[in-house]
């Protein structure tokens, strides 16, 4: 009964709304204002208390903020510093050669892990930045779809009053309108959450309005290529886990060789060293396989994203052609306004998918650059981003 009353109330509000004869064109013209500011007064009312007003930020700035605010980076920095200090002290105290080698390996591995932590934070920033742009576009698209559904419902109600269609058709469109309205609410909520997450990750105040000054999609290059063998070599040199596995196997081998003389090592000690060598060799083999798989998967994903981008471009071109035909039909009176608006919205969504495909492609390129040891922040600087 409560649900039936709720639906009846909603339909009553719809009748009041359609009595005002809303214009779809006005709604569509206002949609760009929603891109990153949310749905207007409702967004401001929902904004956290004390939230700042406006933030303009580029991709490189966002990356710097993520790195500065990353707990993982701070932890890696501390570990790298402690490892370097432990090795320095061991050298000063003239520790045994194998002990020095172990400490040196730990220090070098910690430095590689620090670079990985910084790159991981940078990648998270890029994904969050692109994700915020995508959330804004999705909210804009949902508002446009709602405006189209609203106008279609208004027209269908008029046609029903004129006896041209049945009430079931109107009810179906009312359901479609309510679904579109729910999608708008969820999209606006996702947009607010994306903005809040971005600010929190950079450890800055929450902002009601965020202006993204970098067009991530424009950075994508579908002609980019990588050589599998070259990437594998570079990835091995950059991976802290692979480096640690290699050095551990080397040290285990040296210790095993050093204990082969029965005059200086007991049988149990030699057996333990042999077992340690086998374990180290197995870990190295697993690390090598894991790294090779990661490189292969990353490059396969890159190829897939390039193909997806090309497909989305073709789909957008087809949508453009369909819109041209729809405008001709509308000009000849063969199509209603809401039908033309629906075609326009379909074209906009097709181009939004192209933009998202480009952003996804660029993010994947940065993941590969990070994997092969490139500094993501430096890559962005070389791209001219500030």
Regions from the language model: what does each represent?
Residues 3, 43-59, 113, 201, ...:
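Acidic, low-complexity, intrinsically disordered peripheral segments
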Residues 2, 32, 43-129, 164-167, ...:
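Bacterial Sec-pathway N-terminal export signals of envelope proteins
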Residues 26-37:
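Bacterial N-terminal signal peptides
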Residues 5-26:
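Bacterial N-terminal signal peptides that target proteins for export
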Residues 188-230, 366-386:
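Short, solvent-exposed, mixed-charge loop/turn linkers that connect secondary-structure elements
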Residues 84, 91, 98, 111, ...:
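Coiled-coil heptad-register positions
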Residues 76, 83-103, 117, 137-184, ...:
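Charged, solvent-exposed structural "stalk/scaffold" segments
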């Amino acid at each position: 009964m409560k649900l039936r009353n709720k639906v009846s109330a909603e339909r009553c509000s719809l009748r009041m709304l359609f009595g005002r004869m809303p214009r779809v064109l006005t709604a569509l013209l206002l949609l760009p204002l929603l891109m990153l500011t949310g749905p207007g007064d409702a967004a401001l009312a929902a904004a956290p208390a004390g939230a700042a007003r406006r933030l303009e930020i580029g991709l490189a700035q966002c990356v710097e903020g993520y790195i500065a605010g990353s707990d993982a980076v701070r932890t890696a920095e501390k570990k790298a510093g402690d490892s370097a200090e432990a090795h320095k002290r061991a050298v000063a105290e003239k520790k045994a050669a194998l002990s020095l080698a172990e400490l040196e390996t730990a220090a070098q591995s910690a430095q590689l892990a620090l670079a990985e932590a910084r790159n991981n934070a940078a990648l998270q920033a890029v994904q969050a930045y692109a994700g915020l742009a995508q959330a804004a576009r999705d909210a804009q698209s949902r508002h446009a779809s709602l405006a189209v559904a609203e106008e279609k419902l208004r027209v269908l109600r008029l046609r029903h009053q004129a006896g041209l269609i049945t009430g079931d058709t109107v009810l179906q469109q009312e359901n479609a309108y309510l679904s579109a309205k729910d999608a708008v609410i969820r999209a606006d909520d996702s947009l607010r959450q994306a903005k809040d997450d971005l600010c929190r990750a950079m450890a800055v105040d929450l902002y009601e309005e965020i202006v993204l000054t970098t067009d991530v999609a424009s950075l994508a290059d579908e002609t980019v290529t990588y050589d599998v063998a070259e990437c594998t070599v570079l990835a091995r040199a950059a991976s802290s886990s692979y480096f640690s596995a290699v050095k551990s196997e080397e040290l285990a081998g040296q210790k095993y060789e050093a204990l082969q003389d029965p005059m200086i090592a007991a049988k149990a000690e030699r057996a333990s060293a042999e077992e340690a060598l086998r374990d180290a060799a197995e870990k190295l083999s697993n690390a090598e396989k894991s790294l090779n798989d990661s490189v292969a998967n990353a490059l396969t994903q890159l190829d897939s994203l390039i193909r997806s981008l090309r497909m989305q471009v073709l789909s957008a071109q087809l949508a453009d052609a369909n819109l041209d035909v729809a405008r001709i039909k509308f000009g000849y009176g063969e199509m209603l306004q809401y039908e033309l608006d629906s075609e326009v919205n379909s074209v906009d969504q097709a181009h939004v998918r192209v933009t998202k495909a480009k952003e996804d492609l660029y993010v994947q390129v940065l993941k590969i650059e990070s994997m092969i040891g490139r500094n993501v922040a430096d890559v962005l600087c070389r791209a001219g981003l500030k």
